[in-house]
Amino acid sequence: MYVHGTHVAGIAINNNPYAEVMVARITFDHHAIPAPPTVEVAKKAADNYMATVKYFQDNNVRVVNMSWGWTLKEIEGMLEANGIGKDAEERSKLTRDIFDIYKNGLFNAIKSAPEILFITAAGNSDNDVTFDEVIPSLFDLPNLITVGAVDQAGEETGFTSFGESVDVHANGFEVNSYLPGGNTIEMSGTSMASPNVVNLAAKLLALDGSLTTSDLIELITGGAEKSDNGRINLINPMKSVELLKTVKKKS
């Protein structure tokens, strides 16, 4: 159960002795037939999103990794698996009602903390995040970066989601990191790409703790290298650090 979170955290703090980690635990239902989503459950989740972000603010968190997400299809699939809805039309309406509560709750929670940089995985559907309605990766917020995955050669992986809301890319293929207990394993997914960007943001903050959220985004996206076809915007930590040095000299 804890493999994913441990692996992601290991990537986020790799080779950064100055990084401090705060955990906000999210668990998902892994039963063959998951518990049915309801409006009440969605409202509780929305409240929890806001409370969690407040917890981050109270503890001066600067960067948050989100290697997870929800889609409209997932909600509908859970309703269908539980036989909820007398027909497809009724189930579709209930799906939308529930999903929008999650969506608006998460959007408002992230928006409420402009001083925190949120970095999220684009998703692994090999589809457009807007078409799939993936949250939070479809959000357009000034304190959010959405990350797609490339392989070690810098090419898009076969699974990465894409679209206009995907800001940068990072390695998400066979990334080595820790398991609970200290052993290591290679795992793939945009879940592994996102903490690579968190790792860069944390190292930039280690170099200059006064950087704002907008400064971090400028340095990360400004140092990234866009592919010839425009689909990939691959982070380049060395370039981002050079940009930081240039900014410091000017100031």
Positions of PLM-derived features:
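Solvent-exposed, polar/charged alpha-helical surfaces in well-ordered, non-transmembrane soluble domains
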Residues: 6-10, 47-54, 58, 104-111, ...
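Short, small-residue-rich loop/turn micro-motifs
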Residues: 15-16, 25-28, 68-70, 170-172, ...
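Subtilisin-like serine protease catalytic core
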Residues: 1-44, 141-143, 154-155, 161-165, ...
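Extracellular S/T/G-rich loop segment that most often corresponds to the catalytic His/Ser-adjacent loop
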Residues: 115, 121, 129-206, 210, ...
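C-terminal subdomain of the subtilisin-like protease fold in secreted/lumenal serine endopeptidases
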Residues: 63-67, 208-251
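Substrate-binding/access-modulating region of protease and related hydrolase catalytic domains
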Residues: 27-137, 153, 182-188, 192-194
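Residue-level marker of structural boundaries
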Residues: 17, 127, 184, 225-226
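Gly/Ser/Thr-rich helix-start
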Residues: 6, 11, 70, 124, ...
